[in-house]
């Protein structure tokens, strides 16, 4: 948003009308895997699968909570990689954050993602948690549990491959 506002300000300085300057911005669809919101057969998918840090994961959870949603809000969260010696702590902090920004269901994929569940439980959260061990198991869970009106967030480090689960949802 800040970049778009800066572009509009520069256009204004050069005498370009706001309508003319805004027109290309209206066609901008964002960057693949970075908070792209897609509507698929009655299901809203937030594809934030490209990468993850504690700050960006919390932001994704906030976006999930802010969207209008007729069904369940489901956070599909995978490992955050390359965080250094405080990796476990950072995952647990995301879990504690979920208590204050609840989803209806959390699906965890990866060894480190289990620490998100530990952080949620330690904070006293009672959101239903499901742990999956593979992308295939995640796809099966999605088939069995996602319904019309649901909103899903896919968030994790790129190396976890959540973009494949998003592609699976798009193919359904």
Spans of model-derived segments:
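ATP-dependent carboxylate-amine ligase
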Residues: 6-172
